[in-house]
Amino acid sequence: MVCEKCERKLGTVITPDTWKDGARNTTESGGRKLNENKALTSKKARFDPYGKNKFAICRICKSSVHQPGSHYCQGCAYKKGICSMCGKKVLDTKNYKQTSV
């Protein structure tokens, strides 16, 4: 569960932009090479388990979080009704009986 404000912080998808003037993947701007696999050649998108961008642990259950920039795992965020990135209350779970099984 992610709130509307944190939804903008989520990463971009590895797909090319639409071909228009000023796009970052055109060959004229030097942004994209022909026949380049962006998933393999992008250094900032590559997973580095021992680097400084490793995944955090959940503040509630101490398990690893599978989304960069999040402080809570999806199970705890769903169970508590909070945003997994900032912890803001998204859903009122007072009368719900929720499980994260």
From Swiss-Prot:
Component of the minor spliceosome, which splices U12-type introns. It comes from Gallus gallus (Chicken). Keywords: Cytoplasm, mRNA processing, mRNA splicing, Spliceosome. Signal peptide: none annotated. One of its GO terms (molecular function) is microtubule binding. InterPro entries: PDZ-binding_CRIPT. This is Cysteine-rich PDZ-binding protein. GO terms for cellular component: cytoplasm; dendrite; spliceosomal complex. Pfam families: Cript (PF10235). It is found in: Cytoplasm. Belongs to the CRIPT family. One of its GO terms (biological process) is RNA splicing. As a component of the minor spliceosome, involved in the splicing of U12-type introns in pre-mRNAs.
